[in-house]
Protein backbone atom coordinates (compact mmCIF):
# COMPACT_ATOMS: atom_id res chain seq x y z
CA UNK A 1 0.00 0.00 0.00
CA UNK A 2 3.03 2.25 0.23
CA UNK A 3 4.10 4.05 3.39
CA UNK A 4 1.63 5.97 5.55
CA UNK A 5 3.26 7.42 8.68
CA UNK A 6 0.87 8.25 11.54
CA UNK A 7 2.52 10.02 14.44
CA UNK A 8 1.07 9.39 17.91
CA UNK A 9 -0.92 11.99 19.84
CA UNK A 10 1.56 11.83 22.73
CA UNK A 11 5.03 10.47 23.35
CA UNK A 12 4.90 7.57 25.77
CA UNK A 13 8.04 6.68 27.80
CA UNK A 14 9.27 3.11 27.75
CA UNK A 15 9.22 0.90 30.84
CA UNK A 16 12.22 0.63 33.15
CA UNK A 17 13.84 2.22 36.19
CA UNK A 18 16.36 4.24 34.18
CA UNK A 19 13.62 5.76 32.02
CA UNK A 20 11.69 7.23 34.94
CA UNK A 21 8.80 4.75 35.02
CA UNK A 22 8.30 2.42 37.97
CA UNK A 23 7.12 -1.10 37.30
CA UNK A 24 4.25 -0.43 39.71
CA UNK A 25 2.86 2.06 37.19
CA UNK A 26 2.85 -0.36 34.23
CA UNK A 27 -0.82 -1.33 34.57
CA UNK A 28 -1.84 2.33 34.65
CA UNK A 29 0.21 3.04 31.52
CA UNK A 30 -1.35 0.11 29.62
CA UNK A 31 -4.81 1.37 30.47
CA UNK A 32 -3.91 4.86 29.22
CA UNK A 33 -2.53 3.44 25.96
CA UNK A 34 -5.69 1.44 25.32
CA UNK A 35 -7.77 4.56 25.92
CA UNK A 36 -5.60 6.59 23.53
CA UNK A 37 -5.86 3.89 20.84
CA UNK A 38 -9.65 3.87 21.13
CA UNK A 39 -9.72 7.66 20.84
CA UNK A 40 -7.56 7.55 17.70
CA UNK A 41 -9.76 4.96 16.01
CA UNK A 42 -13.25 6.18 16.97
CA UNK A 43 -13.09 9.89 17.76
CA UNK A 44 -14.13 12.35 15.07
CA UNK A 45 -11.21 14.26 13.61
CA UNK A 46 -10.82 17.23 11.30
CA UNK A 47 -8.18 17.44 8.59
CA UNK A 48 -7.06 21.07 8.88
CA UNK A 49 -4.14 21.18 6.48
CA UNK A 50 -2.90 19.09 3.57
CA UNK A 51 0.64 19.93 2.52
CA UNK A 52 2.82 18.77 -0.37
CA UNK A 53 6.57 18.89 0.17
CA UNK A 54 9.28 18.37 -2.43
CA UNK A 55 7.71 20.18 -5.38
CA UNK A 56 10.04 21.69 -7.95
CA UNK A 57 8.55 22.41 -11.38
CA UNK A 58 5.08 20.99 -10.57
CA UNK A 59 2.31 23.56 -10.09
CA UNK A 60 0.42 23.17 -6.79
CA UNK A 61 -2.97 23.97 -8.32
CA UNK A 62 -2.62 20.93 -10.61
CA UNK A 63 -2.31 18.60 -7.59
CA UNK A 64 -5.12 20.17 -5.60
CA UNK A 65 -7.72 18.11 -7.45
CA UNK A 66 -5.95 14.86 -6.51
CA UNK A 67 -5.73 15.50 -2.75
CA UNK A 68 -8.93 17.45 -2.03
CA UNK A 69 -10.84 14.32 -0.98
CA UNK A 70 -8.62 13.97 2.12
CA UNK A 71 -10.44 16.95 3.71
CA UNK A 72 -13.71 14.96 3.78
CA UNK A 73 -12.34 12.29 6.18
CA UNK A 74 -14.06 12.25 9.59
CA UNK A 75 -12.04 9.71 11.60
CA UNK A 76 -8.49 8.39 11.61
CA UNK A 77 -9.33 5.28 9.60
CA UNK A 78 -10.90 7.43 6.88
CA UNK A 79 -7.93 9.79 6.94
CA UNK A 80 -5.52 6.90 6.34
CA UNK A 81 -7.70 5.39 3.62
CA UNK A 82 -8.28 8.63 1.74
CA UNK A 83 -4.61 9.58 2.10
CA UNK A 84 -3.63 6.27 0.52
CA UNK A 85 -6.12 6.82 -2.32
CA UNK A 86 -4.71 10.31 -2.89
CA UNK A 87 -1.19 8.85 -2.93
CA UNK A 88 -2.26 6.39 -5.65
CA UNK A 89 -3.75 9.23 -7.70
CA UNK A 90 -0.53 11.24 -7.41
CA UNK A 91 1.57 8.28 -8.57
CA UNK A 92 -0.83 7.68 -11.46
CA UNK A 93 0.02 11.12 -12.86
CA UNK A 94 3.42 9.76 -13.92
CA UNK A 95 5.36 12.78 -12.63
CA UNK A 96 6.64 11.45 -9.28
CA UNK A 97 9.15 8.71 -8.57
CA UNK A 98 7.95 8.29 -4.98
CA UNK A 99 5.19 9.61 -2.70
CA UNK A 100 5.16 9.20 1.10
CA UNK A 101 2.35 10.23 3.47
CA UNK A 102 2.76 11.61 7.00
CA UNK A 103 -0.27 12.13 9.29
CA UNK A 104 0.33 14.31 12.37
CA UNK A 105 -1.62 16.37 14.91
CA UNK A 106 -2.25 19.99 13.98
CA UNK A 107 -0.02 22.61 15.55
CA UNK A 108 -0.20 26.38 15.74
CA UNK A 109 -2.60 29.02 16.93
CA UNK A 110 -5.53 27.71 14.87
CA UNK A 111 -5.04 24.05 15.84
CA UNK A 112 -8.15 22.19 16.97
CA UNK A 113 -8.02 19.53 19.71
CA UNK A 114 -9.00 16.89 17.14
CA UNK A 115 -7.23 18.50 14.18
CA UNK A 116 -4.85 16.61 11.89
CA UNK A 117 -2.34 17.66 9.25
CA UNK A 118 -1.58 15.41 6.28
CA UNK A 119 1.70 15.87 4.42
CA UNK A 120 2.61 14.28 1.09
CA UNK A 121 6.37 14.05 0.63
CA UNK A 122 7.00 13.71 -3.11
CA UNK A 123 10.06 13.06 -5.25
CA UNK A 124 9.72 14.36 -8.78
CA UNK A 125 11.00 12.52 -11.83
CA UNK A 126 14.01 13.94 -13.60
CA UNK A 127 13.41 16.40 -16.40
CA UNK A 128 14.80 13.94 -18.95
CA UNK A 129 14.41 10.16 -18.69
CA UNK A 130 15.25 7.31 -21.04
CA UNK A 131 13.97 3.79 -21.41
CA UNK A 132 14.80 0.56 -23.21
CA UNK A 133 12.45 -2.40 -23.40
CA UNK A 134 11.08 -5.08 -25.65
CA UNK A 135 7.52 -5.39 -26.87
CA UNK A 136 5.45 -8.24 -28.26
CA UNK A 137 2.82 -7.55 -30.90
CA UNK A 138 0.72 -9.93 -32.98
CA UNK A 139 3.33 -12.61 -33.65
CA UNK A 140 6.03 -9.96 -33.76
CA UNK A 141 8.73 -8.79 -31.36
CA UNK A 142 10.41 -5.40 -31.27
CA UNK A 143 13.04 -3.42 -29.39
CA UNK A 144 11.91 0.01 -28.17
CA UNK A 145 14.11 2.97 -27.22
CA UNK A 146 12.50 6.04 -25.71
CA UNK A 147 13.34 9.52 -24.45
CA UNK A 148 10.78 11.28 -22.29
CA UNK A 149 10.34 14.76 -20.83
CA UNK A 150 7.79 14.18 -18.04
CA UNK A 151 5.83 17.03 -16.46
CA UNK A 152 7.27 19.35 -19.06
CA UNK A 153 5.19 22.45 -18.23
CA UNK A 154 4.35 21.57 -14.63
CA UNK A 155 0.83 20.22 -15.11
CA UNK A 156 1.38 16.62 -16.19
CA UNK A 157 2.36 17.29 -19.81
CA UNK A 158 4.68 14.76 -21.41
CA UNK A 159 6.83 14.89 -24.55
CA UNK A 160 8.04 11.51 -25.79
CA UNK A 161 10.30 10.39 -28.61
CA UNK A 162 10.24 6.66 -29.35
CA UNK A 163 12.13 4.45 -31.78
CA UNK A 164 11.03 0.87 -32.38
CA UNK A 165 12.81 -1.80 -34.42
CA UNK A 166 10.93 -5.03 -34.98
CA UNK A 167 10.94 -8.18 -37.03
CA UNK A 168 8.36 -6.77 -39.46
CA UNK A 169 8.04 -3.11 -38.54
CA UNK A 170 10.30 -0.15 -37.83
CA UNK A 171 8.94 3.14 -36.54
CA UNK A 172 9.79 6.36 -34.81
CA UNK A 173 7.57 9.12 -33.55
CA UNK A 174 7.16 12.19 -31.39
CA UNK A 175 4.12 12.63 -29.16
CA UNK A 176 2.82 15.32 -26.82
CA UNK A 177 0.41 14.33 -24.03
CA UNK A 178 -1.72 16.76 -22.03
CA UNK A 179 -4.14 15.57 -19.29
CA UNK A 180 -7.03 17.60 -17.94
CA UNK A 181 -6.46 18.91 -14.43
CA UNK A 182 -8.43 16.85 -11.94
CA UNK A 183 -9.38 14.23 -14.54
CA UNK A 184 -6.28 12.36 -15.68
CA UNK A 185 -8.24 9.91 -17.87
CA UNK A 186 -9.51 12.85 -19.94
CA UNK A 187 -6.52 13.83 -22.05
CA UNK A 188 -5.34 15.12 -25.41
CA UNK A 189 -2.47 13.69 -27.50
CA UNK A 190 -0.71 14.83 -30.68
CA UNK A 191 1.51 12.39 -32.61
CA UNK A 192 4.02 12.76 -35.45
CA UNK A 193 5.28 9.45 -36.80
CA UNK A 194 6.85 7.39 -39.54
CA UNK A 195 6.19 3.64 -39.76
CA UNK A 196 7.68 1.17 -42.23
CA UNK A 197 6.13 -2.30 -42.25
CA UNK A 198 6.52 -5.53 -44.17
CA UNK A 199 3.57 -7.81 -44.88
CA UNK A 200 4.95 -11.02 -46.40
CA UNK A 201 1.52 -12.67 -46.70
CA UNK A 202 0.68 -9.96 -49.26
CA UNK A 203 4.20 -9.41 -50.70
CA UNK A 204 3.63 -5.81 -49.64
CA UNK A 205 5.66 -3.15 -47.88
CA UNK A 206 4.16 0.08 -46.61
CA UNK A 207 5.63 3.34 -45.33
CA UNK A 208 3.34 5.72 -43.46
CA UNK A 209 4.23 9.31 -42.59
CA UNK A 210 1.54 11.03 -40.64
CA UNK A 211 0.12 13.18 -37.89
CA UNK A 212 -2.75 12.36 -35.56
CA UNK A 213 -4.66 13.96 -32.71
CA UNK A 214 -6.55 12.01 -30.05
CA UNK A 215 -9.02 13.03 -27.36
CA UNK A 216 -9.81 10.47 -24.64
CA UNK A 217 -13.13 10.94 -22.83
CA UNK A 218 -14.26 8.50 -20.12
CA UNK A 219 -18.03 8.51 -19.77
CA UNK A 220 -19.73 6.48 -17.04
CA UNK A 221 -18.57 2.86 -17.56
CA UNK A 222 -17.24 3.49 -21.07
CA UNK A 223 -14.02 4.93 -22.50
CA UNK A 224 -14.29 6.97 -25.69
CA UNK A 225 -11.50 8.05 -28.03
CA UNK A 226 -11.99 10.59 -30.81
CA UNK A 227 -9.20 10.68 -33.37
CA UNK A 228 -8.21 12.46 -36.54
CA UNK A 229 -5.38 11.06 -38.64
CA UNK A 230 -3.72 12.41 -41.75
CA UNK A 231 -1.21 10.03 -43.34
CA UNK A 232 0.83 9.86 -46.53
CA UNK A 233 1.07 6.18 -47.46
CA UNK A 234 3.61 4.68 -49.82
CA UNK A 235 2.84 1.13 -50.94
CA UNK A 236 5.35 -1.06 -52.74
CA UNK A 237 6.15 -4.67 -53.56
CA UNK A 238 8.12 -6.68 -51.05
CA UNK A 239 9.43 -9.11 -53.68
CA UNK A 240 9.77 -9.37 -57.45
CA UNK A 241 7.35 -12.26 -57.39
CA UNK A 242 4.51 -10.04 -56.13
CA UNK A 243 1.26 -10.58 -57.99
CA UNK A 244 -0.16 -8.10 -60.47
CA UNK A 245 -2.99 -7.29 -58.03
CA UNK A 246 -0.44 -6.10 -55.45
CA UNK A 247 1.60 -4.20 -58.06
CA UNK A 248 -1.59 -2.47 -59.12
CA UNK A 249 -2.03 -1.17 -55.56
CA UNK A 250 1.52 0.22 -55.40
CA UNK A 251 2.06 3.96 -55.27
CA UNK A 252 1.29 6.93 -53.06
CA UNK A 253 -2.02 7.69 -51.38
CA UNK A 254 -3.27 10.29 -48.92
CA UNK A 255 -5.65 9.31 -46.17
CA UNK A 256 -7.50 11.68 -43.87
CA UNK A 257 -9.83 9.92 -41.46
CA UNK A 258 -11.99 10.57 -38.42
CA UNK A 259 -12.54 7.69 -36.03
CA UNK A 260 -14.36 6.96 -32.78
CA UNK A 261 -13.69 4.05 -30.44
CA UNK A 262 -15.87 3.02 -27.50
CA UNK A 263 -14.59 0.47 -24.98
CA UNK A 264 -16.35 -1.20 -22.05
CA UNK A 265 -13.90 -3.42 -20.18
CA UNK A 266 -14.75 -5.17 -16.88
CA UNK A 267 -12.10 -7.91 -17.18
CA UNK A 268 -9.67 -8.47 -14.33
CA UNK A 269 -6.81 -8.82 -16.86
CA UNK A 270 -6.39 -7.88 -20.51
CA UNK A 271 -3.91 -10.69 -21.23
CA UNK A 272 -5.48 -13.79 -19.65
CA UNK A 273 -8.72 -12.82 -17.88
CA UNK A 274 -10.56 -15.03 -15.42
CA UNK A 275 -13.77 -13.02 -15.33
CA UNK A 276 -15.45 -10.01 -16.86
CA UNK A 277 -16.40 -8.84 -20.33
CA UNK A 278 -15.06 -6.62 -23.11
CA UNK A 279 -16.93 -4.67 -25.76
CA UNK A 280 -14.99 -2.59 -28.28
CA UNK A 281 -16.66 -0.74 -31.17
CA UNK A 282 -14.65 1.28 -33.67
CA UNK A 283 -15.94 3.44 -36.52
CA UNK A 284 -13.73 5.15 -39.11
CA UNK A 285 -14.76 7.61 -41.80
CA UNK A 286 -12.17 8.51 -44.44
CA UNK A 287 -12.41 11.03 -47.25
CA UNK A 288 -14.67 13.75 -45.88
CA UNK A 289 -11.69 15.71 -44.51
CA UNK A 290 -9.54 15.27 -47.62
CA UNK A 291 -7.31 12.63 -49.16
CA UNK A 292 -8.03 10.06 -51.84
CA UNK A 293 -9.16 7.22 -49.53
CA UNK A 294 -12.95 7.20 -49.20
CA UNK A 295 -14.68 4.61 -47.04
CA UNK A 296 -16.72 3.89 -43.93
CA UNK A 297 -15.33 1.15 -41.71
CA UNK A 298 -16.90 -0.61 -38.72
CA UNK A 299 -15.18 -3.09 -36.40
CA UNK A 300 -16.62 -4.84 -33.32
CA UNK A 301 -15.05 -7.07 -30.66
CA UNK A 302 -16.89 -8.91 -27.87
CA UNK A 303 -15.42 -11.18 -25.19
CA UNK A 304 -17.02 -12.93 -22.19
CA UNK A 305 -15.13 -14.78 -19.43
CA UNK A 306 -16.49 -16.98 -16.65
CA UNK A 307 -14.55 -18.82 -13.94
CA UNK A 308 -15.56 -22.35 -12.95
CA UNK A 309 -14.39 -25.01 -10.52
CA UNK A 310 -10.73 -25.91 -9.99
CA UNK A 311 -9.59 -22.60 -11.41
CA UNK A 312 -10.82 -23.29 -14.95
CA UNK A 313 -12.07 -20.42 -17.13
CA UNK A 314 -14.51 -20.57 -20.05
CA UNK A 315 -14.07 -17.75 -22.56
CA UNK A 316 -16.12 -16.86 -25.64
CA UNK A 317 -15.18 -14.17 -28.15
CA UNK A 318 -16.64 -12.72 -31.34
CA UNK A 319 -15.09 -10.35 -33.90
CA UNK A 320 -16.74 -8.77 -36.90
CA UNK A 321 -16.30 -5.89 -39.31
CA UNK A 322 -17.17 -4.36 -42.65
CA UNK A 323 -15.69 -1.64 -44.87
CA UNK A 324 -17.92 0.21 -47.31
CA UNK A 325 -16.31 2.20 -50.17
CA UNK A 326 -17.70 5.70 -50.68
CA UNK A 327 -17.68 6.51 -54.36
CA UNK A 328 -16.55 4.53 -57.37
CA UNK A 329 -12.99 3.88 -56.18
CA UNK A 330 -12.45 0.43 -54.55
CA UNK A 331 -10.96 0.08 -51.10
CA UNK A 332 -7.18 -0.12 -50.69
CA UNK A 333 -5.30 -3.27 -49.73
CA UNK A 334 -3.98 -1.27 -46.74
CA UNK A 335 -7.48 -0.65 -45.35
CA UNK A 336 -9.12 -4.08 -45.71
CA UNK A 337 -9.49 -6.76 -43.04
CA UNK A 338 -7.23 -9.81 -42.69
CA UNK A 339 -7.92 -13.11 -40.95
CA UNK A 340 -6.06 -16.24 -39.93
CA UNK A 341 -3.06 -17.16 -37.82
CA UNK A 342 -2.19 -18.01 -34.21
CA UNK A 343 -3.87 -14.87 -32.86
CA UNK A 344 -7.20 -15.30 -34.69
CA UNK A 345 -8.37 -18.48 -36.47
CA UNK A 346 -5.67 -20.89 -35.30
CA UNK A 347 -4.44 -23.64 -37.58
CA UNK A 348 -4.16 -21.29 -40.56
CA UNK A 349 -1.23 -19.20 -41.76
CA UNK A 350 -0.84 -15.61 -40.61
CA UNK A 351 -3.54 -13.58 -42.41
CA UNK A 352 -3.73 -16.36 -45.01
CA UNK A 353 -7.50 -16.82 -45.36
CA UNK A 354 -9.74 -15.34 -48.01
CA UNK A 355 -9.29 -13.46 -51.29
CA UNK A 356 -5.85 -13.91 -52.85
CA UNK A 357 -4.02 -13.58 -56.13
CA UNK A 358 -1.08 -15.77 -57.10
CA UNK A 359 -0.41 -16.58 -53.45
CA UNK A 360 -0.67 -12.98 -52.21
CA UNK A 361 -3.55 -12.37 -49.79
CA UNK A 362 -5.48 -9.20 -50.58
CA UNK A 363 -7.76 -8.91 -47.55
CA UNK A 364 -11.53 -8.71 -47.48
CA UNK A 365 -14.27 -6.12 -47.10
CA UNK A 366 -16.23 -8.08 -44.50
CA UNK A 367 -15.33 -10.72 -41.94
CA UNK A 368 -16.37 -12.45 -38.77
CA UNK A 369 -14.58 -14.78 -36.36
CA UNK A 370 -15.61 -16.55 -33.17
CA UNK A 371 -13.82 -18.57 -30.54
CA UNK A 372 -14.63 -20.78 -27.58
CA UNK A 373 -11.82 -21.49 -25.11
CA UNK A 374 -11.30 -23.49 -21.94
CA UNK A 375 -8.31 -22.51 -19.80
CA UNK A 376 -7.27 -24.74 -16.90
CA UNK A 377 -4.32 -24.76 -14.48
CA UNK A 378 -1.49 -27.15 -15.19
CA UNK A 379 -2.31 -30.70 -14.03
CA UNK A 380 -0.31 -32.36 -11.26
CA UNK A 381 0.77 -29.08 -9.63
CA UNK A 382 2.38 -29.76 -6.28
CA UNK A 383 1.26 -26.44 -4.78
CA UNK A 384 -0.15 -23.07 -5.70
CA UNK A 385 2.09 -20.13 -6.45
CA UNK A 386 5.38 -19.89 -8.22
CA UNK A 387 6.17 -20.29 -11.89
CA UNK A 388 3.34 -22.77 -12.52
CA UNK A 389 0.74 -20.02 -12.05
CA UNK A 390 1.98 -18.33 -15.23
CA UNK A 391 1.02 -21.36 -17.34
CA UNK A 392 -2.40 -22.61 -18.46
CA UNK A 393 -3.56 -25.51 -20.54
CA UNK A 394 -5.73 -24.41 -23.45
CA UNK A 395 -8.52 -26.11 -25.40
CA UNK A 396 -10.08 -24.13 -28.25
CA UNK A 397 -12.60 -24.11 -31.07
CA UNK A 398 -12.29 -21.28 -33.64
CA UNK A 399 -14.30 -20.39 -36.73
CA UNK A 400 -14.52 -17.50 -39.16
CA UNK A 401 -14.83 -16.25 -42.71
CA UNK A 402 -13.70 -13.27 -44.79
CA UNK A 403 -14.84 -12.16 -48.24
CA UNK A 404 -15.55 -9.27 -50.57
CA UNK A 405 -19.12 -8.07 -50.95
CA UNK A 406 -21.24 -7.02 -53.89
CA UNK A 407 -22.83 -3.87 -52.50
CA UNK A 408 -25.49 -3.91 -55.17
CA UNK A 409 -27.03 -6.88 -53.34
CA UNK A 410 -29.01 -6.68 -50.12
CA UNK A 411 -28.01 -7.52 -46.53
CA UNK A 412 -29.41 -11.05 -46.83
CA UNK A 413 -27.01 -11.84 -49.69
CA UNK A 414 -24.12 -10.45 -47.66
CA UNK A 415 -24.95 -12.64 -44.67
CA UNK A 416 -25.32 -15.67 -46.92
CA UNK A 417 -21.87 -15.05 -48.41
CA UNK A 418 -20.31 -14.75 -44.94
CA UNK A 419 -21.99 -18.02 -43.92
CA UNK A 420 -20.53 -19.92 -46.88
CA UNK A 421 -17.20 -21.73 -46.81
CA UNK A 422 -16.61 -21.25 -43.07
CA UNK A 423 -13.08 -22.07 -41.92
CA UNK A 424 -12.80 -23.61 -38.48
CA UNK A 425 -10.27 -25.36 -36.30
CA UNK A 426 -9.84 -27.01 -32.93
CA UNK A 427 -6.95 -28.08 -30.78
CA UNK A 428 -5.13 -27.82 -27.46
CA UNK A 429 -1.94 -26.33 -26.13
CA UNK A 430 -0.05 -24.45 -23.43
CA UNK A 431 -0.22 -20.72 -22.64
CA UNK A 432 2.45 -18.66 -20.86
CA UNK A 433 1.42 -15.29 -19.45
CA UNK A 434 4.20 -12.67 -19.56
CA UNK A 435 2.92 -10.46 -16.75
CA UNK A 436 0.46 -7.89 -18.07
CA UNK A 437 2.51 -7.36 -21.24
CA UNK A 438 1.70 -10.26 -23.57
CA UNK A 439 1.14 -13.99 -23.75
CA UNK A 440 2.69 -16.89 -25.64
CA UNK A 441 0.76 -19.86 -27.04
CA UNK A 442 2.01 -23.23 -28.24
CA UNK A 443 -0.90 -25.17 -29.71
CA UNK A 444 -1.49 -28.33 -31.68
CA UNK A 445 -4.08 -27.41 -34.31
CA UNK A 446 -6.49 -29.28 -36.55
CA UNK A 447 -7.65 -26.93 -39.36
CA UNK A 448 -11.00 -27.77 -40.93
CA UNK A 449 -13.15 -26.24 -43.65
CA UNK A 450 -10.04 -25.39 -45.68
CA UNK A 451 -10.77 -23.65 -48.98
CA UNK A 452 -8.71 -23.44 -52.14
CA UNK A 453 -5.88 -20.94 -51.68
CA UNK A 454 -5.87 -21.03 -47.87
CA UNK A 455 -2.52 -21.56 -46.19
CA UNK A 456 -2.76 -23.96 -43.25
CA UNK A 457 -0.62 -24.87 -40.28
CA UNK A 458 -1.57 -28.46 -39.50
CA UNK A 459 0.09 -29.44 -36.23
CA UNK A 460 2.19 -27.32 -33.89
CA UNK A 461 1.68 -23.55 -34.11
CA UNK A 462 3.34 -20.84 -32.01
CA UNK A 463 1.77 -17.47 -31.32
CA UNK A 464 2.76 -14.35 -29.39
CA UNK A 465 0.80 -11.17 -28.88
CA UNK A 466 -1.61 -9.07 -26.88
CA UNK A 467 -4.93 -9.46 -28.70
CA UNK A 468 -6.17 -13.01 -29.28
CA UNK A 469 -9.47 -14.34 -30.57
Swiss-Prot record:
The membrane topology noted for this protein in its Swiss-Prot or TrEMBL record is:
Multi-pass membrane protein
**UniProt cross-references to InterPro entries, sorted A to Z:** Bac_surfAg_D15, D15-like, POTRA
Q: Where in the cell is it found?
A: Mitochondrion outer membrane
Q: One GO term of the cellular component aspect?
A: mitochondrial outer membrane
Keyword annotations for this protein, in alphabetical order, are: Membrane, Mitochondrion, Mitochondrion outer membrane, Transmembrane, Transmembrane beta strand
Superkingdom as given in the UniProt entry: Eukaryota
Q: What is its main location?
A: mitochondrion
Question: Where are the disulfide bridges?
Answer: none
Q: Where is the POTRA domain?
A: 45-125
Biological process (GO) annotations held by this record are:
cristae formation; mitochondrial respiratory chain complex assembly; protein insertion into mitochondrial outer membrane
Which residue ranges traverse the bilayer? none
Question: Entry's Pfam families?
Answer: Omp85 (PF01103)
Q: Does the keyword S-adenosyl-L-methionine apply?
A: no
Biological role:
May play a role in the maintenance of the structure of mitochondrial cristae.
Q: What does the annotation say about its assembly with partners?
A: Associates with the mitochondrial contact site and cristae organizing system (MICOS) complex (also known as MINOS or MitOS complex).
Similarity comment? Belongs to the SAM50/omp85 family.
* Domain comment quoted from the record: Its C-terminal part seems to contain many membrane-spanning sided beta-sheets, that have the potential to adopt a transmembrane beta-barrel type structure.
From the Swiss-Prot or TrEMBL record, give the protein name: Sorting and assembly machinery component 50 homolog B
